[in-house]
């Protein structure tokens, strides 16, 4: 999910724009998928419950079917709390509720939310419903911090980003509206004639 939402940490979003609607649709699909799988929502690349010979958690991209292009996205079920923190920039009420659910389930550690909760049956210990990935990745904690600051401190990073005159000069690009109709091209008369009478093959 971070591919959709990480830019929102520093770039403002405008109502009824292509960017806003895309981000809201991505979060809505995440919420829907969480309900379908009966787990908290928020899937993004993260560590998961598998370690190497040095007991280091492995890391890879996870996603929701319908949002990602990778095949087999439904084979894994790994929830990354930082994804919900990113969603604070788009759907704050829904994200707060989900973060509260994650906290109530005990997915908080000494430094914030744990890296991930792995619900994939092949990686969950016998007799358990899930496995907590008990690690803290600095970049995910940083994204979470910015998501919390976005809501609690009135979008400070967006204000800072837009205070640069060079960035402000391109602000209109962030305000691109969703097209109401598709563009159509009218062929030239010569093209129509050529298509109607293709040259004979020798």
Predicted stretch roles:
Residues 1-202:
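Ser/Thr/Asn(+Pro)-rich, low-complexity disordered segments
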């Amino acid at each position: 999910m971070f591919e959709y939402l990480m830019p929102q940490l520093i770039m403002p979003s405008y109502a009824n724009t292509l960017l806003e609607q895309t981000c809201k649709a991505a979060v809505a699909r995440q919420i829907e998928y969480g309900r379908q799988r009966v787990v908290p929502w928020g899937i993004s690349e993260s560590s998961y419950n598998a370690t190497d010979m040095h007991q280091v958690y492995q890391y890879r991209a996870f996603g929701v079917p319908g949002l990602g292009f990778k095949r087999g996205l439904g084979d894994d079920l790994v929830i990354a709390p930082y994804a919900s923190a990113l969603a604070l920039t788009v759907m704050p009420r829904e994200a707060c509720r989900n973060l509260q659910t994650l906290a109530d389930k005990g997915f908080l550690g000494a430094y914030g939310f744990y890296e991930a909760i792995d619900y994939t049956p092949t990686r969950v210990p016998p007799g358990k419903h899930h496995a907590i990935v008990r690690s803290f990745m600095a970049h995910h904690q940083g994204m979470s911090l910015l998501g919390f600051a976005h809501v609690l401190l009135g979008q400070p990073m967006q204000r800072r980003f837009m205070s640069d005159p060079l960035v402000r000069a391109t602000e209109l690009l962030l305000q691109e509206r969703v097209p109401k109709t598709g563009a159509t091209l009218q062929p030239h008369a010569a093209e129509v004639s050529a298509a109607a009478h293709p040259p004979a093959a020798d």
